[in-house]
Amino acid sequence: NAEVSGGAIFDWGINVLDQILNIIPDDVAHVSGQNHKRVWTHATNADHAHVTVTFTTGKQATFVHSDLAAARKPKFYILGTEGAIIGDWDPAGEPAVADLPAILTVHHKDGTSRVAPLQPLAPHEFHRSIVEYINNGIPMEVNALQSRNVVAIMQAAEQSALQNAIPVVPILRRS
């Protein structure tokens, strides 16, 4: 329910949008979002959510979460004239949708493609990094500012969704 999760954009978007911002480090120009409530009346989350992040360089990234679509869409896709990156769901999570890291396929202008290897993580890496930060002051890979900006992008997407997908400029911080 939206009262608990913040809605479909917040529920599913936090990790996906963070992954997108790690792939495209450009400044964000604006965000547009849409929520559709069509079928599942027992829950207050949108049945379908669509977020497009437009960067100042003209690049765009799109995140779609749908509990309606007959075919599962990629987690996200970044399309360009020189190539594209498709972030697909990991089938290891089947039959349910699991928030495993996306399988990244890089598509080149010449029509070739390759799956980008994921960096292996040691078990409990997040917790180890917290201990390292507390005990030794070693910065964590994910910092509060990065997380704060992802939340600001989701807030802008929700605001846009309330205004029929009119683009909204998120309030982001650099430091």
Label for each model-derived stretch:
Residues S5-A8, R114-L118, N136-E141:
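Active-site rim elements
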Residues W12-N15, A122, L145-N149:
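A generic structural signal for residues located within well-ordered alpha-helices
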Residues V16-L17, P101, P123-V131, M154:
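A general structural signal for well-ordered alpha-helical segments in protein cores
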Residues T56, V131-S175:
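C-terminal helix-rich "cap/oligomerization" subdomain common to oxidoreductases
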Residues V51-V53:
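Short beta-strand scaffold segments in enzyme catalytic cores
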Residues K37, T41-A46, T56-F126, N143, ...:
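NAD(P)-dinucleotide binding in Rossmann-like oxidoreductases
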Residues N1-H42, N164:
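Predominantly a Rossmann-like dinucleotide-binding segment in NAD(P)-dependent oxidoreductases
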Residues I23-D26, T81-I85, A157-A161:
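Phosphate/oxyanion-binding loops and surfaces in catalytic or ligand/nucleic-acid-binding neighborhoods
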